[in-house]
């Protein structure tokens, strides 16, 4: 909402129709206008190359498993303008909660639910390396330590 309130055109993408409806309702209640679409962050054909000045990952990257992460980062790079910025909000580091520790695949850095990969929790350095390998420069990093797992905020720009 902050960006819309300050005059920016805002787009939101989520796989879940429920999340899109929730965002639309929040913006409508605040009397703000934005564009929300059900879509896949790993495949954004509705957007042109070099279209956005800023892309904000609202805690999405850690929800992606395996190669989907690289596809997402490649799409972000494709639609981000030169000198544009990419803000990432992602769970990182191994879990702290004993229940989650028992369900954490330390080799793949994945939190499992019912035996299936559910979230990716990479160590901070591995997350930074992954983002750099996708041709982003990391400009700033902030870690919030939480009782269940740590959360990284990265500000990046495309190389």
PLM features: residue spans?
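A conserved beta-strand element that flanks and buttresses the S-adenosyl-L-methionine
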Residues: 56
